[in-house]
């Protein structure tokens, strides 16, 4: 028996969301004393509902198994919390992603149905957990309560970033004043094509005006046609594993985080700023959504409202190496202290404690019904009617469930478990 099971809708084909919203939140909860497991939603078995006190469902679409699982959890007063880090719960949001218009009709139809299935499962849950204020505001239309638990860096991310940062500092000391300045754009998926294209006119001007300027593009993106004239100043790399990402971000002087202004993008998190801050690389980002919430313009990052600001502020950062390093240093100080799992552990643990129904266990010698055991089971029924979740622990026996009328009690045996 463990406290919380994370049911994840993402596998190794989409690793970053699972890492931030499952692995990192498990780290937070475990720091607060909770025990956790995770399972991929297609590997979920109905019997697993017996063995946990609460369930976090991350970006899962509704399936027959999940419908049965959710029904059983509700019967046992076990809370269901839906975690989502993007507005992929209603096609009114995803219709605003231009990249989806490039899909084949059958592919788009399947994508839209998956979004609707996620929305259906969300509506069955008791509450939602999410990453930003903008996302929370939209989710309140679908569930009665929403917790904002921002994305944050794990202990592993900190260790990886610290190792890279030491090497970066040694290199900077050896090289002295930089001769080249590198911009970097790190894309998680092809859906970000429209974001980088938004600042292509700015990049054209900067690359043309500054022969010492280089651009690194990492991710599942093709070089925009308008930038091919500057191919000698541009380096393209494919998708990078998260363990190697700090080194690639540290290799650039300015991290670019443009976002087109849509409700979908306003709900996105500040991950790119945090990841760059941990290796002391300054971030220039669009002044919207989580960036506007978290970044202090000119203090620990740079925010840009329009093309003119992008051009002006990027040129300033290109020209002023001391300013770049000062801003990056302040971002590092703040993010390494405040944007990490241990800093946020208390908040999510206290929320979980407040939203957990009373948990009770009846320890019985066995499930053979006798007068005393019958009285214990009547008390168990009364507790369930009052909203508690009840488990039966036996010293021996093979029973996994005890059924009495409409009541289904999970049975955990010391002999079997």
Can you name each region flagged by the protein language model?
Residues 322-353:
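A charged, aromatic-enriched C-terminal amphipathic alpha-helix characteristic of glycosyltransferases
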Residues 1-55, 61, 357-416:
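N-terminal pre-catalytic "stem/leader" segment of glycosyltransferase-like enzymes
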């Amino acid at each position: 028996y463990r406290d919380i099971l994370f049911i994840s809708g993402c596998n190794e084909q989409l690793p970053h969301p699972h890492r931030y919203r499952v692995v990192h939140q498990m780290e937070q909860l475990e720091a607060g004393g909770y025990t956790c497991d995770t399972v991929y939603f297609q590997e979920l078995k109905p019997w697993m509902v017996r063995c946990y006190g609460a369930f976090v469902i991350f970006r899962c679409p509704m399936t027959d198994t999940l419908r049965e699982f959710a029904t059983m959890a509700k019967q046992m007063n076990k809370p269901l919390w839906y975690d989502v880090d993007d507005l992929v719960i209603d096609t009114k949001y995803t219709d605003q992603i231009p990249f989806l218009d490039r899909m084949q009709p059958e592919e788009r139809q399947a994508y839209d149905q998956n979004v609707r299935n996620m929305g259906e499962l969300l509506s069955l849950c008791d509450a939602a957990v999410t990453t930003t204020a903008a996302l929370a505001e939209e989710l309140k239309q679908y569930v009665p309560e929403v917790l904002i638990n921002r994305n944050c860096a794990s202990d592993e991310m900190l260790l990886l970033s610290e190792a890279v940062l030491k090497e970066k500092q040694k290199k900077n000391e050896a090289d002295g004043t930089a001769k080249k300045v590198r911009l970097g754009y790190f894309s998680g998926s092809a859906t970000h094509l429209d974001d980088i294209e938004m600042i292509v006119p700015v990049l054209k001007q900067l690359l043309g005006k500054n022969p010492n300027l280089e651009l690194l593009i990492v991710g599942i993106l093709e070089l925009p046609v308008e930038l091919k004239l500057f191919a000698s100043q541009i380096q393209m790399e494919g998708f990078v594993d998260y363990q190697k990402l700090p080194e690639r971000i540290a290799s650039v002087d300015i991290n670019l985080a443009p976002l087109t202004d849509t409700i979908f993008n306003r709900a996105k998190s500040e991950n790119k700023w945090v990841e760059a801050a941990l290796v002391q690389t300054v971030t220039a980002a669009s002044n919207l959504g989580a960036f506007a919430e978290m970044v202090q313009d000119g203090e620990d990052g740079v925010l840009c409202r329009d093309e003119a600001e992008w051009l002006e502020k990027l040129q300033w950062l290109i020209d002023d190496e001391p300013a770049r390093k000062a801003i990056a240093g302040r971002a590092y100080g703040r993010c390494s202290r405040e944007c990490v799992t241990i800093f946020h552990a208390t908040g999510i643990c206290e929320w979980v404690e407040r939203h957990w129904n009373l948990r009770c266990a009846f320890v019985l010698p066995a499930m053979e019904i006798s007068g005393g055991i019958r009285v214990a089971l009547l008390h168990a029924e009364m507790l369930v009617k009052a909203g508690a979740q009840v488990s039966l622990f036996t010293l021996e026996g093979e029973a996994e469930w005890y059924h009495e009328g409409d009541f289904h009690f999970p049975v955990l045996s010391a002999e079997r478990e």
